[in-house]
Design a protein with these regions (language model features):
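Short proline/glycine- and basic residue-enriched helix-capping loop/turn segments at helix->loop/beta transitions
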Residues: 45-46
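Enriched for short, Lys/Arg-rich terminal
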Residues: 74-97
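Basic/aromatic recognition patch in beta-strand/loop cores that engages polyanionic ligands
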Residues: 49-78
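Conserved N-terminal glycine/acidic-rich loop preference
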Residues: 9-16, 49, 71, 93
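Arg/Lys-rich, positively charged N-terminal/basic patches that mediate binding to nucleic acids
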Residues: 1-34
């Protein structure tokens, strides 16, 4: 059973992050950062309450900082989360969610 799912937008975010990271710091750093994000998704799925509630943005959403990014997610069931977006911390979240 999957513990987390990525929205279409989150998948696009992840591809953009991977492309930027590789072009700036190389494949090894890209692989490391994507692995760290994947580990963060798993941690959030296992402990969905660890993120900061952000109902002021969207009802039921939580956010969790990871390095230069903020992971936005919500619980789907008692056993899974949906990663909604992975946005750079400098972005305007309201316009992206």
């Amino acid at each position: 059973m999957e513990l987390f799912q990525l929205s279409k937008e989150a998948k696009s975010d992840l591809r953009s992050i991977a492309f930027f990271t590789e072009s700036r710091w190389g494949k090894a750093q890209r692989n490391l950062y994507i692995k760290q994000l994947d580990d963060a998704f798993l941690t959030l799925a296992q402990n969905p309450g660890v993120g900061i509630p952000c109902d002021y943005i969207r009802a039921g959403y939580r956010k969790f900082p990871h390095a230069s990014h903020i992971i936005f997610y919500k619980s789907c069931t008692s056993a899974t989360i949906l990663v909604v977006r992975i946005l750079h911390k400098s972005m305007d979240y309201d316009s992206q969610l």
